[in-house]
Amino acid sequence: MRKPSSGQPAGLDAWDETRSLATHAGPDFALYVGDSLDCLAKLPDESINTVVTSPPYWAVRDYEHDEQLGLEDEVDDYVERLVKIFREVYRVLATDGSAWLNIGDSYFNKQITVGGKPPRTGWKRNKQLSLVPFRVALALQDDGWWIRNVAVWHKPNAMPASVRDRLTVTWEPVFLLTKSERYYFNLDEIRVPHQTSDAIERRRAESGTVTGKAQGKKELRKWLNSPRHRATIEGIKEVERRPNAPAAVELASYLRTALKEKKRSIAWVAEQLDLPFERTRHYFRTDEIGSRLPPPEVWEQLKDLLELDATYDEAMTVEVGDNVFRNHPNGKNPGDLLSIPTAPSGANHFAVMPRKLAHFALKATLPMNGSCLDPFMGSGTTGRVVRELGGRFVGVDVNEHYMTDYLVESGVISPETETLW
């Protein structure tokens, strides 16, 4: 059950028009067969809330159609063609809309030609990683899109590569694109549970030994007065502060002067404190990037070792107090690493988007009764998830055969004959 959100469904007033122009249509879907650019031109302006799509990758697979994307001789032509398609996507997308774009990469090899010949010069050479996803992303950025995220789709069940001179590729980028700075994004729909308490609470709560039970107000007061026990209360942590601490650069200059007077080196200090040199030297660095304040225990050791005066005693005094940290009740931001297994190839399509990936994207960017577009719908995974979430789906594909499963499920095609009614 999805929670209501502030997002407004786009294209409701033009939904009948969108369906009437489609090759196949139902109450909650409109499917167009043909070239993406031509089909998108039929859709009304700002009639789509979100886009979830994975276009054919460049030079990876032939889907047996002359007009398909991905068969271009030059990678630059592929990028240019995809940018043109996404200009139409930009037009049909609502002002507060967004687009999730998944593209895989490919390597130049002896089978890939550039201008009809095997690549031999420049960067387009055998065994070179094409970096197609990022070339597309930069081109889209130059064309006016906001790039809000590059999510990593990690494939835990990725097939191992047979190559011996590079790593197996186990991930693909998923770009989150928007038309403007402000857009619909329902983070609460995709939050994940808080798995552990933060380090401060855990360290405080697990230290020491507790005996007996807190009974009555007097014992309860003693229990609350114990920092260790107080830290076990959700949201309350004991923290250390230096409210009057000097700038790290200022203190470093003071320490360097004392070190010079002692005629000692930073290496000597590190040895005396039994600390790594790389850590110790930061306390003596006078540049803002590398300078660090020593922690309380190290500061006390430095005072004794270098025979420091009381100049910074008050400034370096540590105060201990309670801070209240409250985790978001709905969970935490899931982050941009999505570990989702690949989906098995379907009977009618090789590269099937995992339902879990489409579900994640749509939960965040598809409002209730909103509309979603997939200009490269393939077998229709995105459309199925849109239906599950109560949305409206607009799908486009150059090959009608790939739509078979979706059309059977929608009652447009007889499962026995697989012919159009």
From Swiss-Prot:
Gene Ontology molecular function: any one: N-methyltransferase activity
Keyword NAD: no
Database matches in SUPFAM superfamilies: S-adenosyl-L-methionine-dependent methyltransferases
Class of this enzyme: transferase
Biological process, per Gene Ontology: DNA restriction-modification system; methylation
Catalytic activity, as annotated: a 2'-deoxycytidine in DNA + S-adenosyl-L-methionine = an N(4)-methyl-2'-deoxycytidine in DNA + S-adenosyl-L-homocysteine + H(+)
EC number: 2.1.1.113
Record family assignment: Belongs to the N(4)/N(6)-methyltransferase family. N(4) subfamily.
Protein name: Type II methyltransferase M.SfiI
